[in-house]
């Protein structure tokens, strides 16, 4: 399995984006610091590891691992699985694609933010916020990968 990584910047934190791939699964690893990691439009597995990370899965059926630290996860469309790990994490399911995402928040005080009537399933989330499609679109545009 080939993994292609494009390092965008290294200034106190690592920002990484994977090269697009439709025919294979891309695996992306973060560092012990505060990383910004982004997947492709295909299926990705992203391991953020330690640090307060921002993880963007983009389109495709993705698996996102937050690790230690206060992480923020933004999966895209598709059937996505998010594991928050330790820390106070924020997991999103805002794609409005009617897919059964899984949000496993983990230890810490974690928040899941989803579109109302989304079929997402939750585990270990202390707070679940349900937004209207309009509110979700505005939030995704302001902080997610639109």
Task: Kindly give the residue locations of the regions a language model identified.
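Bacterial N-terminal signal peptides
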Residues: 8-15
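N-terminal segments that cap or nucleate solenoid repeat domains
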Residues: 22-58
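Composition-driven, intrinsically disordered low-complexity tracts enriched in small residues
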Residues: 138-146
């Amino acid at each position: 399995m080939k993994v292609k990584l494009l390092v965008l910047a290294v200034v106190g934190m690592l920002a990484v984006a994977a090269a697009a791939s439709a025919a294979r699964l891309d695996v992306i690893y973060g560092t012990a610091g505060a990383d910004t990691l982004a997947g492709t439009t295909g299926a990705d597995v992203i391991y953020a590891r330690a640090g307060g990370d921002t993880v963007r899965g983009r389109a495709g059926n993705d698996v996102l691992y937050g690790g230690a630290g206060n992480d923020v996860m933004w999966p895209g469309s598709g059937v996505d699985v998010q594991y928050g790990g330790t820390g106070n994490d924020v997991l999103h399911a805002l794609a409005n694609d009617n897919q059964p995402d899984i949000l496993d928040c983990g230890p810490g005080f974690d928040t899941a933010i989803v579109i109302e009537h989304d079929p997402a399933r939750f585990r270990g989330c202390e707070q679940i916020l349900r937004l209207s499609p309009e509110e979700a679109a505005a939030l995704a545009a302001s902080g997610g990968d639109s």
